[in-house]
Amino acid sequence: MSEPVPVERPVLQLRLVVEAEDYDAAVAFYRDVLGLPEQAAFEGVGDARVAILEAGRATLEIANPAQKRMIDEIEVGRPTAPGVRVAFEVTDAQAMTDRLVTAGATLVAPPVETPWRSLNARLGGPAGLQITLFQELETLDERRDKSGFGTDRERHED
């Protein structure tokens, strides 16, 4: 069993680094269309460029193969996601889906309500990213007492 997380957390930020062949198009899509504010940008030798976009609160979602297959089935109806899929919580999944598709994203599957009460859409975005847009339809507190919700630690307590 793993050690409990200390009160003072050692990790301060999760940063997902994505290589984009068409850097300008990817930055414009994620910054200007999806609306992720630019925190910083740097240039280096040999046309090296990077933009760091603020994406709000970050979490690392670890799923086993069965969960990945289930999510693909719910959101898309077939296996589709690569090993990494980027999910963005939005306030209006349908409106943001429409906005991103208009800007060039590929619609993989339109918004669908999930068993855990979120509205999820799947898109193909620049830099080869598969994107889930999700809109929460209930708060964590509203879900807490429902079957299947909680934490792994709660489910495996002796």
Description of each model-found segment:
Residues 8-10, 17-60:
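Core segments of cupin and vicinal oxygen chelate
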Residues 64-70, 135-138:
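Acetyl-CoA-dependent GNAT
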Residues 4, 72-76:
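Short, P/G- and charge-enriched loop/turn segments at secondary-structure junctions
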Residues 53-56, 123-126, 136:
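Active-site beta-strand termini and strand-to-loop segments that position acidic
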Residues 1-27, 84-88, 136-158:
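N-terminal beta-strand motif that seeds the catalytic metal site of vicinal oxygen chelate
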Residues 17, 37-45, 112, 134-144:
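Conserved catalytic-core motifs of GNAT/GCN5-like acyltransferases
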Residues 20-24, 79-130:
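Vicinal oxygen chelate
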Residues 56-60, 66-69, 92-95:
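Short, charged/polar surface micro-motifs in flexible loops or helix N-caps
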